[in-house]
Amino acid sequence: MEITNLLEFSHRAQLRDWFERHAATDKECWIAMYRVKRPAECSGCLPYIDVVEEALCFGWIDSTLKRLPDDRLAQRLSPRRKHSHWTELNKQRCADLEAQGLMTDMGRQAFALAK
């Protein structure tokens, strides 16, 4: 699978802004990120939890993970399909995000199909 539409964000709010503008129309994106700890030299990447939580807020899901040449990772995100499998962890994350007021209508619709 080829990495296309690689996006780099320094802050979670930038990713959320991208989702607000593109979640309803785009079919996929790849997000530059790191998995555990943020290296001091890693600008233009987000932690995994920020990426997955924002994706869930808009009804998207993370899937394929690839290593980039500079040792960062690229996480593929795409809209959830109607009858896709939801892990209990992601169901709990959605409930937590809803309680924080972060879920969008798109995210709520995707989550409602999982119940």
Question: Regions from the language model: what does each represent?
Answer:
Residues 1-115:
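Charge-dense, helix-prone N-terminal extensions
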